[in-house]
Amino acid sequence: MIYFFISSLFFLILITLMFSKNIFKNIKKIKLFSKNNFFFYFLLFVLFIFIFWLVVYTDQGIKVANQKIIYFLTSYFLEILLSIDNVFAWFFIFKSLKIPLIYQKKVLLYGLWGALILRSIFSFSGSFLFSKWHWILYLFGGFFILTSLKFIFFSNLECDNKEENIKKLWIYKFFRVTENINNENFFVKIEKKIFITPLFVSLILIELSDIVFSVDSIPAALSVNNDLFIIFSSNFFAVLGLRSMYLFTAYFLKNFPIMKYALSLILMFIGFKILIEKFFTFSIFLTLAVILIILITTFLINLIFNLKKC
């Protein structure tokens, strides 16, 4: 399987390079959500699953191949769902710094590289830590439950001056930052001094938000399975998917706000799953079934509320 891991990793990097080369050449022509983007992402996703299943089937048989696919899909759904709040963070950052949509694309696409590198580091280091000191996973289990409860009961408490507070961050204390953006430049020279632009500030903040939101998503994926390739590849597609469907995801969350509570319930379920694993083991099929039931139920409830409003 080590050869499969290496070849598959090369495949993912190659696809990313091809994708990045294309999008950076035509940065102003890209739509953050379009039929072409969605078709490309979906085709890549299906192609990967098929190749993954075929190689595992050839090497270890159909039973293991089917199980690995279920592991991948469960990890992928977890990564998507637990990272989806990141989209709200992106909107808040862009709105606060007054970044036009045309330049938001550049930040998200450059940020794709940083997100993949950081999540890869977290995946490998997390897998090592949990294999050496398994009890650390129980700490995350308790953390997941507390986080979900905090979100359910205190999610409506907001600060009134969020947009002003973003300009009081450490970035503004340690760097010279221009008041306005300078086209698509990250750096500008003013009176022989180098300044960073709000566009670069937004890139830094979005990378930091990726780190924050990966704190729960990666341990959650590790609680489902410890296959590094599955964790890495599910992370890859989750990160790529959220960025390629940025506007659609934001629109969906805005019009289906109850879905945010589904994320809390899923996080709570994962927390309990980790804490009671010594007494009761959830099969991967049961785990995936619970996640889908929570999602479908909350979606239908939200849909009913939306229809009643109309």
UniProtKB/Swiss-Prot annotation:
TM annotation in the entry: 1-21, 38-58, 74-94, 110-130, 135-155, 194-214, 228-248, 256-276, 284-304
Listed GO CC annotations: plasma membrane
InterPro entries the UniProt entry points to: Integral_membrane_TerC
Principal location class: membrane
Compartments it resides in: Cell membrane
Membrane topology label: Multi-pass membrane protein
Keywords attached to this entry: Cell membrane, Membrane, Transmembrane, Transmembrane helix
Pfam families: TerC
Family assignment from sequence similarity: Belongs to the TerC family.
Protein name, per record: Uncharacterized membrane protein BUsg_160
